[in-house]
Amino acid sequence: MVEEEQPISVDYEVFGKVQGVFFRKYTQAEGNRLGLVGWVRNTDAGTVTGQLQGPSEKVREMQVWLQKKGSPKSRITKVQFQNERRLPKLEHSTFSICK
């Protein structure tokens, strides 16, 4: 019997030209494609913040996507990840865009 890996959670903040370029919509779509849950929102400081939850391999893929790709018109200058932790179970059921 193979033991299922505990999901992980990580918070992120993306800097650069990430507002007004559909960054949240593309982030939600990529999170859904990878089977992740969490959320994404714009900040008053012009950044995008959020949380990723799911299998560590998929979370790592999403971290690379946030650093290297983003939405087609975005210009990412920096991404900060913090508060990484293992979870007994997922805390979200979907990947949502917060207003």
From Swiss-Prot:
Pfam families: Acylphosphatase. GO terms for molecular function: acylphosphatase activity. The active site is at 24, 42. It is an enzyme of class 3 (hydrolase). Residues 9-99 form the Acylphosphatase-like domain. It catalyses: an acyl phosphate + H2O = a carboxylate + phosphate + H(+). Gene3D superfamilies: 3.30.70.100. Keywords: Hydrolase. Its EC number is 3.6.1.7. Belongs to the acylphosphatase family. This is Acylphosphatase-1. It comes from Xenopus laevis (African clawed frog). The lineage of its organism: Eukaryota, Metazoa, Chordata, Craniata, Vertebrata.
